[in-house]
Structure formats: C-alpha cells, structure tokens
Amino acid sequence: MLYEIKNDKLSISADTFGAELHSIKLDGKEYLWQCGDAWKRYAPILFPFICSPKDRTYKAGGQEYHMAANHGFARDSEFAFSGSTKNSLSFILKDNDVTLAQYPYHFELEVTYSIKGSKVTVTNTVKNTDEKAMYFYLGGHPAFICDIQGGKCTVEYEKNEHIVQPCLLYTSPSP
C-alpha cells in the first residue's frame, strides 16, 4: 500500500512493499526514477546483503544458507506500516519463516522517511532481537531522474574504476 506525506515544498510517497520510496517531488517536479523498462525499481532497501555472497550462498553458525535474491530480501518483502506523523512515514520488517530460511537471525528493520522544508531524511534502524551476534549489510539504492537535454550531462569518477564482475568495482586494474 502506498502512503504519502507532503509540505508546501516537497511530497514523497513510499510503499509497504519493500518500504520503497516511489516518488520525491520538489515544487511539483519528480526527482525519483519512475520504474521503467530499463529498471523496474525506484529506491530499494538493501538488507541483509549488498550485492550477494558468491553463488548467493554463505555459512553462519556452521550451517549453509542460500540468499534467494541479490541485495537480500528486504526489497522484496512486505513491510508493516508502523505509523506516520505530519512529516514522517515509518515501515517495519520483522524476521519470519521466509527470512529465517535465508538469514538465521531474529531482527527488526525499521525504515522512516521524514521531510522538512525541501529535505528528505531516511533513517534505517536495525534491531537484533536475539542474544547472538547478528551480521548484516544495509544500503539504499535510490535511482534519480537525470535531466539530460542536448547531451549536456557527463559522469565523472574521482578514480578510474574497473568492473571485475557484477557488483565488484576496483580502483586499480585487475590482474
């Protein structure tokens, strides 16, 4: 389900599916990628992995686990809407049978989107609800609309980067 908040400058909407932002509009202009054929997402939450382990398989506590998707399961999970204020939306994902089959940890992942003036703030809170140590990665993958008109846009990097394999960049040439 899609939820929206707005003020006099900014409006955002986010979905319970993946706790994913679907829109960021400033003065009525959309700044978030609107899910086209090139990429069918907007701004996924990456948890408990960024990219994935080799062959999507890893060991934890002496047992082998298989992560079903690249970047973990949060982006493909239904979050509960946990509340809103005039300026914020919050979503929560708790471990369940599907997550525990891929990731042997008890957790709560809360994602809160807040707006103030023309600023959007994203707050991610991961809570370990078990006694044992919990290992995870957390990231955001927002896609922004680039206003490319007449070829006046360039992409520059501070260092030369080389793609060694999907999801791996190195700043020095590969062997």
Where are these regions (language model features)?
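Beta-strand-rich N-terminal accessory domains
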Residues: 1-60, 64-69
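Hydrophobic residues embedded in beta-strands of well-ordered beta-sheets
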Residues: 3, 21, 89, 120-122
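Acidic, contiguous internal or C-terminal segments within carbohydrate-active enzymes
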Residues: 5, 95-147
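Residues that act as N-cap/strand-start positions at coil-to-secondary-structure junctions
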Residues: 6-8, 18, 52, 73-75, ...
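Broad, structure-driven detector of short, well-ordered beta-strand segments within folded domains
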Residues: 10-14, 111-113, 155
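Extended, loop-rich substrate-binding clefts of extracytoplasmic carbohydrate-active enzymes
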Residues: 68-116
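A contiguous pocket-lining binding segment that forms or flanks enzyme active sites
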Residues: 143-169
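Conserved small/polar residues in nucleotide/adenosyl-binding loops
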Residues: 170-175
